């Protein structure tokens, strides 16, 4: 499929703003914005640096205000929404084409006989963004002027700039900025590359659309330090979300260069102590990185089929979530960002996403490092659910993250037969189960009466349905949750297999699993023909139809008979299935909310009360195949997600959708477990 738009999208501001792009650097930093180049979220910017990888994410550079001048006539290429609700300038009207090359966004601006190409990409492993402008055609020289708008704030916040004096200092090729005493310095640098000949514009050794790395003399880029606040950017998406929707940014420097055909102007934005301004060489490094990602995937692709282009794109998207988490004694630790632009690394999300992001894409070494990294954080039999951005202690408020960890290790071992890691982690897993049986935080403990896991205490959300409004947990699910006990049964069966593999006693695990399977029968609701969502809660059983019961079918070990598995799949298909995921609640229930919109309390009240979750389509497709044996139909459930790669987060899959048709995309523009589970299910279902 073509990840490309013409003026039918780029020329309509509301449509161009509804499509967002994302580039990442592998350490938690990123750049993101809209196809229209407007700032509509507080998270939009050209350099959101992970100053304490993978977190500490700080907006350093918001945007470059772009303009051209040809034959003495200026033309603004930028577009901004302002607090007074005006829109100026209107540069989006000159965007002739937008496309992705790999994960790199590329714009073509066309004005009269002038055409300029712009691309934005990041240096792998560094808080460095390259913004490259290449003159494609013009009958006369064209002057490009770029005003750099900077900031220095937490990426969740907004800025009021009045009275804030930053230190802007000229340096070779640009300016150095110190926002306040103790702030991390960052630089804005400019360089002109290429040979001004018509032949050069066809491309060259620098890669498609880029030039050889010969550099023009430094003075050919004029750099002027500045210090002028631009007040009142209106963040339309934040306004829709009921949040502070006004932001200010500092104009800290202007870059000006005259381009002949074949020239390329590169502006480098970086918080690194040393950085190269050679844009063409940086682009080659970016290309090599993505080529390596695809090569690893191709080596492990199953069967003789040629995967569709949208699956190939998801492999590149998968790479964006896997980032470094350095630890004492383990500088190469890895983790998974749950979603861009606002999530950090979450234990549950990491373990659910790990097989699809690493094993399916042919990178088991990454999976091993992630599993080893998280083992370091095991405490009282629990993995952390969240690592706060501000560097506080991890939060241990998940009943299922550790159970998903067991399943992730199972998937890793099935793919690699790495007995070495299994022997290393087996004692950790055995200790985890001991804690779960005897009791750990938040009332998580085995019920000796039936062997099932129970969990919950007032004010604490423990399952993946974890929304809260103030102090109220929207879906508390206190008691024995169905997917938790499906995972518990799966973990015990897996531990029995692990024990045999490493030469330990397996009967104890098998005996516990048999007991749980018997107890799991209590979830069955004969009247409705599906499983209860929670039993033994404060108010008894909760018989609402939710997708959580699917995991009793889709996991490697199922506690259900074949007949009941089929009934579960049928119930979910009839009432929860959509073309983009599964609803989190049966629409027939009076608590159903079909639209995810409004302020934080309204949105959180709908988050798991009908909102569609894309990641659930993978488990559903696998469950369907398990009971019906029809690979082609099962894969057919996944195919509509291909259209989402051009509908919201371009080149990726987002988090959630409205429960009601037409199922508008909401939430994050790129969600790890949506990408991962789609990739994993597609691969497992290969003929």
Predicted regions and their residues:
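Acidic, mature catalytic/reactive cores of soluble proteins
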Residues: 1-687
């Amino acid at each position: 499929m073509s990840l490309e738009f013409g003026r039918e999208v780029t020329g309509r501001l509301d449509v161009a703003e509804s499509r967002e792009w994302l580039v990442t650097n592998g350490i938690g930093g990123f750049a993101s914005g809209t196809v229209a180049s407007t700032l509509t979220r507080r998270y939009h910017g050209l350099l959101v640096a992970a100053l304490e990888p993978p977190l500490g994410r700080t907006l350093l550079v918001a945007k470059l205000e772009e303009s051209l001048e040809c034959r003495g006539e200026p033309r603004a290429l930028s577009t901004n929404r302002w607090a007074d609700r005006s829109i100026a300038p209107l540069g989006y009207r000159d965007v002739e084409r937008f496309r992705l090359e790999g994960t790199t966004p590329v714009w073509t601006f066309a004005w009269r006989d002038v055409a300029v190409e712009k691309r934005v990409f990041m240096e792998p492993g560094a808080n460095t963004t390259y913004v490259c402008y290449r003159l494609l055609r013009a009958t006369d020289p064209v002057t490009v002027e770029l005003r750099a708008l900077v900031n220095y704030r937490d990426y969740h916040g907004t800025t009021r700039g009045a009275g804030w004096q930053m230190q802007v200092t000229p340096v070779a090729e640009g300016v150095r900025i110190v926002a306040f005493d103790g702030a991390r310095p960052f630089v804005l640098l400019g360089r002109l590359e290429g040979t001004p000949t018509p032949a050069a514009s066809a491309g060259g050794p620098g890669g498609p659309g880029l030039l050889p790395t010969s550099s023009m003399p430094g003075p050919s880029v004029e750099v002027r330090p500045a210090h002028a606040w631009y007040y009142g950017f209106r963040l339309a998406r934040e306004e829709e979300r009921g949040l502070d929707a006004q932001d200010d940014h500092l104009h800290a420097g202007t870059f000006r260069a005259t381009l002949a055909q074949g020239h390329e102007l590169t502006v480098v934005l970086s918080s690194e102590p040393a950085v190269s301004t050679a844009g063409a060489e940086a682009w080659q490094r970016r290309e090599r990185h993505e080529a390596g990602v695809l090569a690893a995937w191709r080596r492990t692709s199953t069967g003789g089929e040629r995967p569709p282009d949208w699956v190939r794109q998801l492999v590149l998207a998968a790479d964006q979530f896997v980032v470094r988490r350095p630890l004492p004694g383990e500088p190469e630790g890895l983790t998974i960002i749950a979603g861009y632009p606002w999530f950090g690394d979450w234990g549950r999300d990491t373990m659910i996403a790990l097989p699809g992001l690493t094993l399916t894409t042919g990178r088991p070494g990454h999976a091993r490092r992630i599993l080893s990294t998280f083992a370091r954080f095991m405490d009282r039999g629990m993995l952390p659910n969240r690592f706060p951005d501000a560097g506080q202690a991890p939060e241990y408020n998940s009943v299922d993250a550790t159970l998903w960890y067991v399943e992730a290790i199972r998937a890793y071992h099935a793919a690699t037969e790495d007995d070495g890691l299994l022997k290393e982690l087996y004692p950790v897993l055995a200790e985890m189960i001991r804690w779960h049986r005897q009791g750990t935080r938040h009332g998580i403990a085995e019920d000796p009466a039936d062997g099932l896991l129970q969990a919950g205490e007032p004010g604490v959300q423990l399952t993946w349905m974890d929304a809260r409004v103030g102090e109220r947990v929207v879906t508390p699910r206190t008691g024995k949750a169905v997917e938790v006990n499906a995972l518990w049964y799966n973990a015990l069966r897996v531990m029995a297999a692990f024990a045999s593999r490493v030469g330990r006693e397996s009967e104890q695990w098998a005996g516990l699993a048999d007991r749980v399977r018997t107890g799991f029968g209590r979830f069955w609701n004969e009247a409705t023909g599906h499983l209860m969502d929670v039993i033994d809660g404060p108010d008894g059983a909760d018989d609402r139809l939710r997708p959580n019961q699917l995991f009793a079918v889709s996991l490697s070990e199922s506690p259900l008979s074949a007949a009941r598995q089929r009934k579960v799949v049928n119930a979910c298909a009839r009432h929860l299935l959509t073309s983009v995921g599964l609803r989190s609640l049966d629409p027939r229930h009076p608590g159903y909310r079909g639209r995810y919109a409004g302020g934080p309390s309204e949105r959180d009240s709908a988050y798991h009360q009908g909102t569609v979750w894309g990641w659930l389509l993978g488990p559903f497709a696998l469950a369907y195949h398990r009971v019906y044996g029809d690979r082609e139909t099962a894969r057919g459930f996944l195919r509509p997600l291909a259209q989402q790669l051009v509908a919201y987060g371009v080149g990726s899959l987002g988090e959630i959708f409205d429960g009601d048709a037409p199922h508008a995309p909401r939430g994050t523009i790129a969600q790890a477990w949506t990408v991962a589970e789609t990739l994993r299910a597609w691969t497992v279902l290969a003929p």
